[in-house]
Amino acid sequence: MKLNLVQIFFMLLMLLLGLGMGLGLGLHMATAVLEESDQPLNEFWSSDSQDKAEATEEGDGTQTTETLVLSNKEVVQPGWPEDPILGEDEVGGNKMLRASALFQSNKDYLRLDQTDRECNDMMAHKMKEPSQSCIAQYAFIHEDLNTVKAVCNSPVIACELKGGKCHKSSRPFDLTLCELSQPDQVTPNCNYLTSVIKKHIIITCNDMKRQLPTGQ
């Protein structure tokens, strides 16, 4: 039996109407699932999108919670200073990178030249005598001297440095952290890893005539 044009047109029209109703019903059901379910919306995301969101949130948290504590509680005496100690500690719920560093002068850690941040170059002037143990870790603060001194005008906070009274910077400071690439190296063959970071600093401000605060 042959179909005329009218019958063919009618069948196509019915087919299109059926598809339209099916799509509408499907969208309605999908909406109902989202409205009635307690399932978090992020479970409907693609795994890639969810991973990116979590990574961003974790990254933001890291930038705001980590703090570097540098202690210069002792004035450097002639000769090679003892190696600083660097480790991680959990204080007040925040991960804090703790360091102890000795400074021979303001210029030792207040370096304003942002173009040269390579630790091997910055640490070279500390290798005064051959066959001496390399300094294990050292931190350089790339801020104006007055900016660092101004931290001492901030409210006193409790800390575990000598005296138990410290001051925290109101903003992250630009720092270069130098860490020996391998233990038991001796001068002049000291090789350092360079980490350019921004962290709040916590400092002690005792005897400002002889020492400058360092920080968290």
From Swiss-Prot:
What family is this? Answer: Belongs to the pancreatic ribonuclease family.
Pfam families xref list:
RnaseA
- Alphabetized UniProt keyword annotations: Cell adhesion, Fertilization, Glycoprotein, Secreted, Signal
Stretches of the chain forming a coiled coil according to its record: none
Protein name (database record): Inactive ribonuclease-like protein 10
- By its UniProt entry, which SMART domains does this protein fall under? RNAse_Pc
Q: Where is the signal peptide?
A: 1-26
Cellular localization per UniProt? Secreted
Which parts of the sequence are annotated with region: Disordered?
43-65
May I have one GO cellular component term?
extracellular region
Q: What does this protein do?
A: Secreted proximal epididymal protein required for post-testicular sperm maturation and male fertility. May be involved in sperm adhesion to the egg zona pellucida. Does not have ribonuclease activity.
Q: Name one GO biological process term.
A: heterotypic cell-cell adhesion
Tell me where on the tree of life, at the top rank, the source sits.
Answer: Eukaryota
Description of post-translational modifications: The N-terminus is blocked. Glycosylated.
**Molecular functions per Gene Ontology:** nucleic acid binding
The protein's matches in InterPro entries, at most eight in alphabetical order, are given as: RNaseA (IPR001427), RNaseA-like_dom_sf (IPR036816), RNaseA_domain (IPR023412)
According to its UniProt entry, this protein's organism is: Homo sapiens (Human)
CDD domains per UniProt: RNase_A
